[in-house]
Regions:
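Short, glycine/charge-rich flexible loops or terminal/linker lids adjacent to PRPP-binding catalytic cores
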Residues: 95-139, 153, 221
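Active-site-facing substrate-recognition patch
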Residues: 14-78
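Short, Lys/Arg-enriched N-terminal segments with co-localized hydrophobic residues
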Residues: 1-15
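Short helix-loop-beta connector
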Residues: 76-80, 133-136
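PRPP-dependent phosphoribosyltransferase catalytic core
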Residues: 15-25, 157, 161-236
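A contiguous pocket-lining binding segment that forms or flanks enzyme active sites
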Residues: 128-172
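Short glycine-rich phosphate-binding loop at a beta-alpha junction
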Residues: 79-87
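Gly/Ser/Thr-rich loops at beta-strand to alpha-helix junctions
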Residues: 87-93, 148
């Protein structure tokens, strides 16, 4: 007897890297990614919500750094010098990911961040925290989630002001696949505007493909009703 043909969803899931599947489960397990009825800062209603501030324990941060490290390795390789994490949430992300890159791949990269206000005293005076940026540095920017390009609008000139620095790309944990100022997604607009690639560990499309009608943390996170709500959200 012939085996039944896999559904398109299962075919896409089978192509998904194992660490991406694990990261999706990790987000739900850590209560970083939730499904239900939420009101975003913009006032828009959303059937899902992500709060990267819910990563609070040592074990969670260790795993988070490892997922970022694997995604950066897959998308940009490890031929770069600095992880830049914009203040504030990007600061711990750049630190834990630099540690993970060393632990997983034996490669040393520096971390750097900006201060909201420049420090005017001491040996580390100035706008930057951690490593200084210097001519020739190759930088990967690391953030939690990008729903618009506002953060990069602030970060890009800070990095460029440090000298002849190459930005190899941006890595976020989840691409919400939200529209930017036009019809394209925020990450697509960043790529077009600034000329460097922008990627995510996973996209909402990955999340839907993997979690649809699949038990996770003792329940079906995305059933038919929730999937319909998410589809309607993206059609607005």
């Amino acid at each position: 007897m012939r085996e039944p043909m896999p559904s398109p969803e299962n075919m896409e899931e089978n192509k998904m890297e194992q660490y991406k599947k694990e990261f999706i489960e990790f987000m739900v397990e850590s209560q970083v990614l939730k499904f239900g009825e939420f009101t975003l800062k913009s006032g828009r209603k959303s059937p899902f919500f992500m709060n990267a501030g819910a990563y609070v324990t040592g074990s969670q941060l260790k795993r988070l750094g490892e997922y970022y490290a694997k995604a950066i390795h897959d998308n940009y390789g490890l031929d770069f010098d600095v992880l830049f994490g914009p203040a504030y949430k990007g600061i711990p992300l750049s630190v834990v990911t630099a540690i993970a890159i060393h632990d997983l791949y034996g490669v040393e990269v520096r971390y750097c961040s900006n201060r909201k206000e420049a420090k005017d005293h001491g040996g580390d005076a100035g706008l930057l925290l951690g490593s200084k940026l210097k001519d020739g540095d190759r930088v990967v920017i690391i953030e939690d989630v990008t729903t618009s390009g506002k953060s990069i609008e602030e970060t890009f000139p800070i990095i460029q002001a440090q000298g002849n620095v190459e930005i190899k790309g941006l890595m976020v944990s989840l691409n919400r696949m939200e529209r930017g100022k036009g019809d394209k997604s925020a990450l697509e607009e960043i790529q077009e505007t600034y000329g460097f690639p922008a990627n995510a560990i996973v996209t909402m499309e990955d999340v839907i493909t993997y979690l649809y009608n699949r038990p996770c943390q003792g329940k079906i996170q995305i059933d038919d009703k929730m999937k319909a709500a998410i589809d309607a959200y993206y059609e607005e």
